[in-house]
Regions:
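ASCE RecA-like P-loop NTPase motor cores
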Residues: 1-179
Length: 179
């Protein structure tokens, strides 16, 4: 893959931390999304760590940062059936130099792995957050196990799986050498 075709942008003035979530943070994230997509019209996927946070950010984007004449938005919903999934992905089959499609989806969900949107079907992915899983007894057992082997258990139980989700989602945009 030609690295000159890649733009890697990082916004370090926003966060997806649960304790900082709210209307102001959602609006700042929506502004970042607007800034990214204003550079080039086309189809984008925006991945967020949960359905609730996806709703907050998508609502903020659609309300204050979306030119509805030139931008369409769609959202992943919980418990999507096969036809709904196909319809969601089907929206990405066309692209335009004058119009954008923004798909909001959940990081680690059905659209962040195993989909193949080649060429201009998808020109950008925006990952919001690190994908670190919630604390649970299973992950805590993994953390304790790896801590006991002399390595950082938190990295193995939380950081690596989270970053794997981020990399999988980012990989949706580069499917061929021509992308």
């Amino acid at each position: 893959f030609d690295p000159d075709k890649r733009a890697l942008l990082i916004a370090n003035d926003v966060t997806s931390m649960y304790k900082r979530r709210g209307p102001e943070e959602s609006d700042r994230i929506a502004q970042c999304i607007e800034g990214v997509i204003s550079g080039r019209h086309g189809n984008y996927l925006v991945f967020l760590p949960s359905y609730a946070f996806m709703k907050e950010v998508a609502d903020a984007f659609e309300y204050d940062h979306c030119d509805h004449k030139r931008i369409d938005t769609i959202r992943q919903t919980q418990n999507m059936g096969e036809q709904e999934r196909a319809d969601f992905l089907g929206r990405f089959e066309t692209s335009s130099d004058e119009h954008s499609l923004i798909g909001f989806a959940v990081l680690g969900g059905i659209f962040s792995e195993g989909i193949d949107l080649k060429h201009d079907s998808l020109i950008g992915v925006i990952n919001v957050g690190t994908g670190i899983p919630q604390v649970c007894s299973e992950r805590e057992m993994l953390r304790q196990y790896f801590d006991g082997t002399g390595v950082n258990g938190y990295d193995y139980a939380y950081c690596y799986p989270g970053m794997n989700k981020v990399l999988q989602a980012a990989g949706r945009v580069i499917r061929t050498a021509e992308d």
